[in-house]
Design a protein with these regions (language model features):
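Extended acidic/polar, glycine-enriched regions
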Residues: 39-88
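Low-complexity, Pro/Ser/Thr- and charge-rich linker/hinge segments at domain boundaries
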Residues: 3, 76-97, 102, 106
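Beta-strand/beta-sandwich contexts
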Residues: 1-21, 78
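A structural motif
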Residues: 13-15, 60, 98
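Substrate-binding/active-site clefts of carbohydrate-active enzymes
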Residues: 103-149, 153-233
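Surface-exposed loop and edge beta-strand positions of immunoglobulin-like domains
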Residues: 16-18, 49-51, 154
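Short amphipathic beta-strand and strand-loop transition segments with alternating hydrophobic
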Residues: 3, 33-38
Length: 233
């Protein structure tokens, strides 16, 4: 999913699956400008030009001479009116930095998740302690009373490292709020509750800090995808 009407009309899609580099990519209604293949045979990087593409549902077709074709639906959404004019944060803001795992535990039921490796242990300073998005929501009145105009959370995308994941600077799924914090919908609720208070929400997302559990680290598109040395890599 992406949006039409963006100032930058170029878009790169990363397609990942077993042997996808062996396929050819076509589309009857999307303008494909380039298709890039790297060392791993499981990736296709498809470049699109969306300059004249309207909002709607589209389709990419992957074809192989000896295998069944694959149809991939893709949605372009319409941008909200005035979205390009949103004001960001600046030097006039009072920014409150929160490490969510260490702030407040609003929902003890999500402290651990069966699919996520690192478990809570309040006695271990290197382990998770149970703070979450609900804990932040529960304390918004307190934060507002301090005069805060913007909250900057350290990353909240899933970090499935087996230990030390509380700081969240090693994303394993950049599209999923870590389920020990809540859900994507709960993050939207946090944003909505802050908007009622005229407060801004800053999302911290570091694109070169990925977990060993991220699929692009487990299966590198190319050897030079990340810096690699004899030690500390």
């Amino acid at each position: 999913m992406w949006w039409s009407g963006m100032h930058n009309t170029n878009l790169m899609l990363t397609l990942y699956g077993d042997g996808l580099a062996e396929y050819e990519v076509t589309s009857n209604n999307l303008t494909i400008t380039d298709v890039v293949r790297l060392e791993s045979k499981n990736y296709l990087f498809v470049y699109l030009d969306l300059a004249t593409t309207k909002p709607g549902n589209y389709q990419l077709v992957l074809e192989h001479s000896q295998k069944a074709s694959i149809q991939i639906p893709y949605e372009l959404m319409e941008r909200r009116e005035g979205s390009a004019e949103r004001k960001g944060y600046d030097s006039s803001d009072f920014i409150y930095l929160i490490m969510p795992d260490r702030f407040a535990n609003g929902d003890p039921s999500n402290d651990a998740h069966p699919e996520l490796l690192d478990k809570p242990n309040r006695k271990d300073p290197w382990a998770r302690h149970g703070g979450d998005l609900q804990g932040i929501i529960d304390h918004l009145d307190y934060i507002e009373e301090l005069g805060v105009t913007a909250i900057w959370n350290t990353p909240v995308a899933e970090d499935n490292d087996p230990e030390g994941s509380y700081h969240m600077y090693a994303a394993s799924n950049v599209y999923q709020i870590d389920r020990r914090f809540g859900s994507n919908d709960l993050y939207k609720k946090l944003s909505a509750e802050m908007k009622k208070r005229n407060m801004k929400l800053i999302m911290d997302y570091v694109v070169n800090h990925w977990s060993l559990e991220h699929y692009m680290i487990k299966d590198l598109p190319a050897a030079d995808w990340i810096n690699q040395w004899d030690s500390y890599t």
